[in-house]
Amino acid sequence: ALIPVIAAYFGVTQVGWSVGNGGVVKLTAESALLLCAGAYIAQLAAVYILGEYINWMSRSFGVTGDESQRHYEGTALAVYSSTPMMLAGIVLIYPQLWVVASVFILAACYSVYLIYEGIPILMNIPKERGFIYASSVITVGLVLAVVVLVATVIVWGAGFGPIYTN
């Protein structure tokens, strides 16, 4: 989970980014540190909440077995399926929009694939039921992404937004 945070810190403070023909934009070290710390907390919270959701929904989809085993498997799936997104964060060293967007779209596709493949295997349910279960997990993941974006807007509006150098 530290890969995207450290890469983003380096990228926005040392490399910077540009939009169109504009100059290179960078953040101050203090501003970047605050934003990266918030991103780190948001990543960990999102993975934890997704894992808890997977565990909570297991009863609804007929998953049998020991509750502690189910809890472990749901959390493991949340961590495992978020790994491509975390590893893709290395691209934030070079924060150019088209590069970052391309890599993160590919990583998101692979994460979705891992969820669709992993739910039936880890929860020991038929693929048909696993498809619906995985679809609900992905929906919650998308809702979590929107919640993080809204929280970012609220935090920035409260005065904790980025501070640019020039």
Provide a role label for each language-model segment:
Residues 1-69:
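Selected alpha-helical membrane-embedding segments in polytopic membrane proteins
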Residues 61-146:
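Hydrophobic alpha-helical transmembrane segments and adjacent short intramembrane/lumenal linkers
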Residues 33, 37-38, 102, 146, ...:
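Alpha-helical hydrophobic membrane-insertion segments
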Residues 7-21, 25, 29, 86-99, ...:
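Transmembrane helix-loop junctions in multi-pass membrane proteins
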Residues 20-36, 40, 106-114, 137-141, ...:
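Hydrophobic transmembrane alpha-helix bundles
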Residues 1-8, 43, 47, 51, ...:
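Hydrophobic alpha-helical transmembrane segments in multi-pass membrane proteins
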Residues 146-166:
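Juxtamembrane boundary at the C-terminal end of a transmembrane helix
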